[in-house]
Each structure stands twice: as C-alpha cells, then as structure tokens.
Amino acid sequence: MDEKQLSIDIVGLLGACSDALDCIEAELVNISNKHGKRVAYMSVCMAKYWNVESDALQDLAICALLHDNALTQYIAEEVQKNHGIDVSDETLNEKTNLHCIYGENNIAKIPFKTNVSNVILYHHEHANGRGPFKKVWQETPLFARIIHLTDVVDAIASSWEFKQEKWDICCEFLVKQKGQLFDDECVEAFFKMISKETFHSFEDGTFESKLWAMVPRKKQMVDWNTCKNIADFFANIVDYKSPFTSKHSMGVAEKAAQYAKYIGYDVLDVEKMYLAGALHDIGKMAVGNEILEKPDKLTDEEFDKMKNHAGYTYLILSQVDDFEEIRDWAALHHEKLNGKGYPFGKTADELNEQERIMACVDIYQALTEERPYKKGMSHEKTCDILDDMAKKGFVDAEISHKIRTCFH
C-alpha cells in the first residue's frame, strides 16, 4: 500500500480505550469507571516531582491509561483453561505476571516518543522484591513504580464507601507500606504532589480536564503500519472480551478494508475503514458476558442491553477530537436503511456509503465466522441472506451484490 499518513488524536483515542477497559474491571473487581484516567492523572502529577519532560509525561500518561490493557486476554485464557475465573482465588496474585507480560507485548504496537520498556511489565512489582517478578525498586523503572502506587491507591479509594475518609485511609496505607509495596521516594512524591483536593476532583469529575491540560492531546501523523498496529491493539482487546466473538473485530476490519480497496477507495480511506472496523464493537466492553455468551435466545430486556453496545461505541469514540467520521462508520453498523436499526434508527438518506458497507461487512463476518455455538456459514449462503435483507430494505443492495464477488 502506498505510504500516506492519517492524522489521529492518539492520546484521546487511547484515553477512550481506557474507559472501555474500565468497564471490564468494573465487571470483574468492582473498580469504578474512569480508573485508568484517575491513575493517569495521579501518575502525571507525581511525575512533576522529578521534573519529567513533556514527551515522557505523555508516554507515562499513555502507560497509565493502558496499564491493564491485557485484562481481557488474561481472563479469556483463564476461562478457557479453568472453565471460569474466581477472583477470590489466592493464586491470582501469582498469575499477575501473565497479565503484565501480555500487556507489555501489546503496547509495543503503540507509537511512544520515549523508551517505556518494562513499564507495563513491572507495574505490579513491590519495592521489597516480593512482586510477580521479584524485582526490588532499584531494578524497576520509575514509571512502573509510579503506576503501581497510583493503581493501588485508586483501587483502595474506589472500594471505600465513605467519601470523607478515602484520603485518610489511603495515606495510612501508604505510610504502612513504605519500603514494602512502595519505595520511599514514590511515597514522598505522592504526599508532595497529591492532596485531598485531588480526591475531590475525582468525585466532581474535574480531574479529567486537568489531566488533558497537563498532557495536551495533539494530533499525530501516523503511517499505515502504525495505524494498523493501533487498530489491531483495539480489536484484540475487544475480541478477547468473549470467545463467542473471538476475532470478529479483526475480521470486520480486514474485510472492510478489502471491500474499500476493491471498489477503488484511496489509501487513506482504506486505512480509515480498517480502523473503523477494528473499533466498531468497542462498546461491547460495557456489555456483560452473561449476555454476550448466553447460548439461548435473549429476552427483550437482554436484547435491549445488547443493542446498547452500538451506542456505547458512539459515546466512547465521541471523546476523540476530530474523529466523527470514523466514529460514525464504526458505531452505525447496526443501522438499517428502512429506519429499523439501532442505536439511532437512521434511515437510508441519513446513512452514507461507508456506514452501509460496515453494516453489510459486520453481518457477513458474523455469519461466516465459527463460534463456540455454531459453525461458520458458507460464502454463498451468507450472500443469499444479505441479498434477501437488501430486498427487505435492511441493507444496501449494490454493496450486497459486490460482496459476493469481492469476498469470493
């Protein structure tokens, strides 16, 4: 593919991703939403203690936002091996190293400006060397030590019911764990740079704008390989959410780009279609697995919750600056030309070609892919179903017709 570059608000996009990841943590361990952004804000505040320069500060924020990026992958493997996961299992702490290894490998896809090697890998290490990899604080990168402290502090604060006591409880814990979980320097930095007012900003929501003021979100020009890496990063996180939809996002991304190239889109639009395909189901991170993995027909109430995922995708991607086009291509994949789709009930005159393509590609991928409860449907049978849907006014007939030859 010819080298052309796409302009993306990468920090904003990764911040939106952290909100989606937080939905998984909220479902699993009852940590409140915006966990990643709170960890990022405290981490950036603490880093000022060491006068960390702007590029490194941005990279720290990204690492903090994505510190639990491998959570869905880790859980998926545990579920597959053990037919479930018990969060009270005492051996989970010993298995934390897997989540760190996967996370370190995943963020290699992100275009950092500075060296962040081992930051995610060692973000659960203890100062006294009793963490997953037995590294003492002197062997652990500063950013990993900062994220470890802020991650634990936010988990404690999130679990404490009484707002007025959160600060005192966290401070007592840090003093007690000085030299054990956390090194003296990081504890000192916390008390110098974080205050009770910081916790108040978590309650009233003002911390998020303060975070972006400290870490400006500037659009970056990215080439195709970088764009694909970012897209694949998101798709893998979504697809690991449930084995019932494993590889679905990757499949939609690949086929959306394949179709766009087939009908003559230019390089940048092919890239954007790939990215939109990778992101189209990011809203499913906010839908419980009891619904995603239910083998029986969903009740009306359950189906309404399932349908919410498209709206969640729209809301998540709305956080990204100048991303409206890709947001719409991604989020409107369940809209129908006759106005009977969701989340907005848009009609034919409100749906552009890219949104219509994504709707058809999503259906094609869902029908042809193999899932735990069904075998994949043949190309011909799937195309027949799409043609029938076109006749009924659900999808675009021309796109359905071209898919028959494009994906053959």
Can you describe what each PLM-predicted range is?
Residues D2-H408:
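Histidine- and acidic-residue-rich, metal-dependent catalytic cores
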